[in-house]
Amino acid sequence: GQVAGQYLFDNYSGKNVAIVHDKTAYGKGLADATMAAFEALGGNTALYEAYTAGEKDYSALVSKLKQNNIDALYVGGYHTEAGLMVRQMRDQGMNTQLISGDALVTLEYWAITGDAGQGTLMTFSPDPAKDPANAGLVKKFTDAGITPEGYVLYTYAAIQTWAQAAGAAGSNDSDSVLDSLNSGSFDTVLGSLSFDDKGDVTLPGYVWYVWENGGYDYL
């Protein structure tokens, strides 16, 4: 939310910004955090709307965006709905910039949007698949027919972390492993991980990705 809010302010301050969400804890939380950060910097949200996930036709919302001359649309939600929205915006001749979060870091997004997804921006943590140290592991995944995109290697890191914590604890007992997790540092495909006093994992900061020609990469 903070990173996206800053980007909106830096690039769209004084322009028409819309923020929409799918009413889920994830989507609304992301949208609200982005709007709070944007407006705290002095930005003005021209339109704030909720939509229903699972629908196929977002033409009413898109028409509203068009009527309000929206320059940038932030979507707090998942790739399916965001993909339909950007496709329907392009069908209505709109060049509005679509921005979202980590849920759009999946090849399924482009399968929905086609060329309409060109230039879509999203925030996500640095891609561990691009780390040369993980080249061997990435090859194992691809050889098995699995593209290590999105959260695949993050899930792998979670398993690595648990296994190391259990090993350090000398037990699979949940309380023992939890104590080990809270006090240790763990070597993973993401780098060295530990947990803070709140129990949150210390991960690298968010970076920007852009969709171009059927794939996504760092902006």
State where each predicted segment sits.
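Extracytosolic ligand-binding ectodomains
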Residues: 1-219
